[in-house]
């Protein structure tokens, strides 16, 4: 994290200009966005400390995956809007290539599946191969799907 400094053995947080512009969980998941057990434990420890100062609505945790998908799309748009700046093609030479859009599409499709799974009360982890989970349809992935 670029906004956490270690000074004399103490962690100091700074740069809160993008904080508190959405649900509290948005600030949390950006700092602790992993899906693994270690991140889940860190997130829980953070929340226990956080709640010593302010209440946290844990039902907001279900927003992590939709916010992750939104962030993915927003990041691609952010790069595209700044592509005229010469520093961007130098630092993101893969952006805008057929391969990058293919990867972006696959990532967003996978994220949509995770969001739908969590919305139905499931885990962020894919089901075990032996499980016979009902297949997702376009209606699960697109709110305005009529077909």
Specify the residue positions occupied by each region the protein language model found.
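Active-site acidic catalytic loop and adjacent metal/ATP-binding pocket
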Residues: 1-28, 32, 135-147
